[in-house]
């Protein structure tokens, strides 16, 4: 046994966070710590890592056992390069090696000196215990696995990004090889290949691993036990997260059955007491039942965190089949190309996941697709009848006021009961509906935005990293809601469980190139990508006469005119939408009607423009193909 917890408890003033927690950690345990946000997982970690020393009960670590914890803000030496920072983990070993070299020179002069031999053995043990002779091999292995290419090893630590610093801290901790490795959300800031490397590394780790994570894919691949922190206590389950779910369901069913039996017995005893206490002949028996009732401890009913949210995304308006059309779409920021010319069509009811390494431009691409940012070239077109809703990474659009006001101001015809019932489906119950929006956590802001989207009834969803800030149970609820959604979905995510559950194509964006893969497994195996219709890169050959050249010039001019007018219409569309949502227009029925009519006419004209543009492009492509076949 490496760690033992016995009746552990922790309170902050009158608030009890943990109570009567008992568990143990054995060598080679792989323990996933799960629970709702705020359940006490962080408090438990701070006790385990010695941050909190004031607690009830017993927490003991076996003598000689080392604990390693990934501190998010652990200091690194900004004067070193990446490789030098990794070597600094071996400072005692490097010191022992240097001392051994000096010692060996002395031993050469005095080979029979027993004290020198004894000191040599001590230094040798220090080096062997840390696998010092394989130091550089292990450093290179871990750096490569954690996503640091060899040409970056000389990069100064002081210029690394936040994500790179987090990966470097984790790499150093892995090298130190503590007996118990304690990790808090280790897959944050990691790309898919690095996640898989880390999973394989941890599965073969010689010590024990405790990890707090909301990443179900990771918990399923690595963990052999689950610690569920819930309602001030903790329960241990055998197996990975998928194995934990049915065990929890069975345990909750048994607990509910016992709770119901206890309540029924209490009611039966109380009924007997009420009927017989006043009768002289049955007073003693009633008093006996009263003592029995006073001693009865009613089993607490289970609280099901895994299924607390009840929401679905539904829509009313059926759009055109070709719903999101990308034509030679190009995105640049300054001199950097995020997306080279790319053509693709998302049809009604289809799903498309956008993935790629950090900084590849996924969120920028999503902003172009949902109309928040203009492309550098080409175009994005939403089909007729599209009713989009947008979930951005930063929920800045939710302003001040209370939670209940966010919904009520937008839907004033709803009664208070209707608003509160709706918010309850997204986890806002009781007094939490009156909580100020500025006091909400990231997870609460996300749930509030989901509450808005449900009422918007969109047939097209643009979601940018919607699982960020969500606990694992809310992620499960969101996954179920998206799987049940029959509208069109464009989704940026790094959640591998969500990706596999949706079982849809993945647009992988890297180094300016977009490639479509049929699934996550195909992406990781780098299987042949799904075919995507794109224009030939071979230039058209000119073999026409004068009339054909004239017509091609007309088509180019028409396409350019359509694109210019569509861009102007798009800008006006954004202006009108902003005006319609402003209080000045929203509260003026006549003005609102005028603006709405103008927007409707504008969108009809956009459809006409797009039809003309599409016909011209198709005719132009026919000329190009004909020209290519002339030679």
Q: Would you name each region that the model predicts?
A:
Residues 1-257, 308, 312-631:
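ABC ATP-binding cassette signature C-motif
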Residues 247-272, 276-296, 300-302:
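Intracellular alpha-helical coupling/juxtamembrane segments of multi-pass membrane proteins
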């Amino acid at each position: 046994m490496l760690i033992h917890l016995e009746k552990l408890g922790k309170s902050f003033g009158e608030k009890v966070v943990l109570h009567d927690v008992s568990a143990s950690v054995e060598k080679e345990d792989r323990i996933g710590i799960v629970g709702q946000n705020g359940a006490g997982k962080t408090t438990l970690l701070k006790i385990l890592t010695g941050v909190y020393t004031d607690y009830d009960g017993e927490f003991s670590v076996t003598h000689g056992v080392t604990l390693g914890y990934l501190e998010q803000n652990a200091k690194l030496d900004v004067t070193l390069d990446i490789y030098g920072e990794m070597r600094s983990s071996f400072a005692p070993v490097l010191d022992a090696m240097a001392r051994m070299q000096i010692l060996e020179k002395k031993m050469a002069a005095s080979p029979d000196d027993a004290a020198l031999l004894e000191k040599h053995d001590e230094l040798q043990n220090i080096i062997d215990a840390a696998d010092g002779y394989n130091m550089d091999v292990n450093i290179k292995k871990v750096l490569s696995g954690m996503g640091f290419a060899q040409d970056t090893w000389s990069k100064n630590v002081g210029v690394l990004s936040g994500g790179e610093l987090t990966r470097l801290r984790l790499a150093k901790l892995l090298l130190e090889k503590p007996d118990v490795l304690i990790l808090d959300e280790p897959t944050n800031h990691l790309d898919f290949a690095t996640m898989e490397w880390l999973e394989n590394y941890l599965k073969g780790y010689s010590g024990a691993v405790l990890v707090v994570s909301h990443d179900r894919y990771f918990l399923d691949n690595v963990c052999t036990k689950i610690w569920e922190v819930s309602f001030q206590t903790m329960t241990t389950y055998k197996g990975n997260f998928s194995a934990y779910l049915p065990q929890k369901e069975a345990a909750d069913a048994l607990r509910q059955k016992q709770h119901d039996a206890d309540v029924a017995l209490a009611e039966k005893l109380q009924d007997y007491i009420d009927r017989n206490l006043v009768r002289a002949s049955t007073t003693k028996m009633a008093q006996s039942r009263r003592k029995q009732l006073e001693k009865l401890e009613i089993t607490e009913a289970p609280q099901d965190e895994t299924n607390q949210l009840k929401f679905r995304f539904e829509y009313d308006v059926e759009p055109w089949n070709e719903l999101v059309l990308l034509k030679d779409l190009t995105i640049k920021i300054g001199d950097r190309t995020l997306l080279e010319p790319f053509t693709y069509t998302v049809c009604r009811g289809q799903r498309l996941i956008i993935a790629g390494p950090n900084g590849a431009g996924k969120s920028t691409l999503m902003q172009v697709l949902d109309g928040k940012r203009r492309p550098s070239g080409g175009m994005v077109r939403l089909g007729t009848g599209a009713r989009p809703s947008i979930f951005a990474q930063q929920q800045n659009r939710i302003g001040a006021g209370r939670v209940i006001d966010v919904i009520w101001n937008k839907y004033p015809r709803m009664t208070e009961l209707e608003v509160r019932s709706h918010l309850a489906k997204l986890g806002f119950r009781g007094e939490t509906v009156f909580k100020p929006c500025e006091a909400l956590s990231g997870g609460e802001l996300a749930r509030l935005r989901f509450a808005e989207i449900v009422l918007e009834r969109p047939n097209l969803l643009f979601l940018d990293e919607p699982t960020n800030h969500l606990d694992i149970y809310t992620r499960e609820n969101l996954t179920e809601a998206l799987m049940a959604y029959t509208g069109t979905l464009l989704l940026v995510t790094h959640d591998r469980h969500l990706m596999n559950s949706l079982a849809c194509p993945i647009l992988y964006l890297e180094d300016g190139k977009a490639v479509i893969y049929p699934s996550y497994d195909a992406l990781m195996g780098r299987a042949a990508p799904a075919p995507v219709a794109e224009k030939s890169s071979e230039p058209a050959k000119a073999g026409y006469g004068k009339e054909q050249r004239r017509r091609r010039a007309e088509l180019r001019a028409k396409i350019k005119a359509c694109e210019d007018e569509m861009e102007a219409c798009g800008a006006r569309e954004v202006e009108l939408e902003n005006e319609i949502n402003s209080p000045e227009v929203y509260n003026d029925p006549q003005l609102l009607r005028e603006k709405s009519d103008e927007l409707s006419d504008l969108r009809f004209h956009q459809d006409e423009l797009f039809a003309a543009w599409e016909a011209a492009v198709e005719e132009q492509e026919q000329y190009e193909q004909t020209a290519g076949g002339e030679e």
